[in-house]
Amino acid sequence: MGIEYRSLHTSQLTLSEKEALYDLLIEGFEGDFSHDDFAHTLGGMHVMAFDQQKLVGHVAIIQRHMALDNTPISVGYVEAMVVEQSYRRQGIGRQLMLQTNKIIASCYQLGLLSASDDGQKLYHSVGWQIWKGKLFELKQGSYIRSIEEEGGVMGWKADGEVDFTASLYCDFRGGDQW
């Protein structure tokens, strides 16, 4: 039997599914996954990959409100993309992202994510591009430049019609802003 993919809203996840998700994220990120990171994972849509009843892959799409230069936009922000170690390099991550693209296309003006160096190749393969514009984050009521994040944030739009050199301003949240 193959891998089964399910799309669910956080409100539809059972306690045991949330616990399995947390365990997968801690393992997949080798312990470098904070409580803030987990909070960022909740409150939106999840695409989950199962091998029978075992959760082996996950990605979340969370609604965020940002600005593209001076224009407010609704963003589907990708969080907590992970595939269990023994299931990697089998196309599961690609399938998770293809389904993510469909959700973003139907619900948001733009898709964004903060990619690890290892993840960029996968995201490029499903149409995501490095954001070339300046990045800003809200800190104590003022926007400051997120220089350390530049080159790691990627964007995707179904029709491709977005200026990837425009400045992006992200909303405020606990933990990492991007």
From Swiss-Prot:
It comes from the Bacteria. CDD domains: NAT_SF (cd04301). PROSITE patterns: GNAT (PS51186). One of its GO terms (biological process) is response to antibiotic. Substrate binds at D32, E79, A80, S114, E148, E149. It holds the Pfam family Acetyltransf_9. Homodimer. NCBIfam families: AAC_2p_Ia (NF000108). This is Aminoglycoside 2'-N-acetyltransferase.
